[in-house]
Amino acid sequence: MARGQQKIQSQQKNAKKQAGQKKKQGHDQKAAAKAALIYTCTVCRTQMPDPKTFKQHFESKHPKTPLPPELADVQA
């Protein structure tokens, strides 16, 4: 292999560049999406982002179960 050393240097340079790009990017989409899911259904443990969606879910999936008190005044 005539370019063995050059290949290794190129790989190291690329790894350093990729690490810099990842650090510059800051956050990932999965963590942000997971943080947005703050409401959890007490019956099925499904997570929802806002109370309106939570109330719609509860009324459609669990119609026989009484509505939780935090959803009583939410407009769906």
Curated annotation (Swiss-Prot):
Q: Which terms under GO biological process does the entry name?
A: negative regulation of DNA-templated transcription; negative regulation of stem cell population maintenance; regulation of translation
Q: Check the record and name the PROSITE patterns matching this protein.
A: ZINC_FINGER_C2H2_1 (PS00028)
Q: Where are the zinc fingers (C2H2-type)?
A: 39-62
Query: What's in the GO CC field?
Result: cytoplasm; nucleus
Q: What's the chief localization of this chain?
A: cytoplasm
Question: Cytoplasm: present as a keyword of the record?
Answer: yes
User: Which regions span the lipid bilayer?
Assistant: none
List the protein's name: Zinc finger protein 706
Q: Locate the compositionally biased regions of type Low complexity.
A: 1-13
Explain the purpose of this protein: Transcription repressor involved in the exit of embryonic stem cells (ESCs) from self-renewal. Acts by repressing expression of KLF4.
Gene Ontology MF term list: zinc ion binding
Record's compositionally biased regions (Basic residues):
14-25
Q: Which InterPro entries match?
A: MBS1/2-like (IPR045230), SERF-like_N (IPR007513), ZNF706/At2g23090_sf (IPR026939), Znf_C2H2_type (IPR013087)
UniProt biased composition (Basic and acidic residues): 53-62
Where in or outside the cell it occurs: the entry states: Cytoplasm; Nucleus
Species of the source: Mus musculus
Ranges where the record places region Disordered: 1-32, 53-76
Q: Which UniProt keywords apply?
A: Cytoplasm, Metal-binding, Nucleus, Repressor, Translation regulation, Zinc, Zinc-finger
